[in-house]
């Protein structure tokens, strides 16, 4: 089994997120242990307030439940609370970490933090899927 890890807010699960999960699952193809196991880490409300300056439209439990209900996802969990957002990587021990095309929070030191943990993890930046149509910031405008 190839563990693929993704992170995000996922504030209203939409087709862009589903495409993101499908792209992440494809990253396991061609790997020695190629049965994909997709782990989704859902950002905590407190983390989102710190990084985006606002609460998400849906609270962390609602967002987690929506991800858990997705047939594409093997495991869903809330992100860590506290000062070490990278802790979950050591807990999960992924083979691949996939980042969204527009994902910037906690990514600038990701390679460095993985090396500090003594891990060998591939990091892949995935392609957008109709970002002018499927982006939570557009879909959640009310």
Q: What name fits each language-model region?
A:
Residues 1-142:
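Nucleotidyltransferase catalytic core that binds NTPs
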């Amino acid at each position: 089994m190839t563990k693929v890890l993704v992170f995000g807010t996922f504030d209203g699960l939409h087709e862009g997120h589903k495409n993101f999960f499908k792209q992440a699952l494809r990253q396991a193809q061609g790997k020695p242990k190629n049965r994909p196991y997709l782990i989704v880490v859902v950002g905590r409300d407190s983390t989102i307030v710190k990084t985006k300056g606002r609460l998400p439209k849906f609270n962390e439990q609602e967002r987690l439940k929506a991800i858990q209900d997705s047939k594409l996802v093997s495991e869903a969990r809330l992100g860590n609370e506290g000062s070490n957002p990278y802790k979950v990587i050591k807990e999960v021990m992924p083979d691949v970490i996939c980042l969204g095309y527009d994902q910037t929070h906690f990514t600038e030191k990701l390679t460095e933090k993985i090396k500090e943990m003594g891990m060998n993890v591939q990091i892949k930046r995935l392609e957008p899927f109709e970002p002018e149509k499927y982006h939570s910031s557009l879909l959640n405008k009310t």
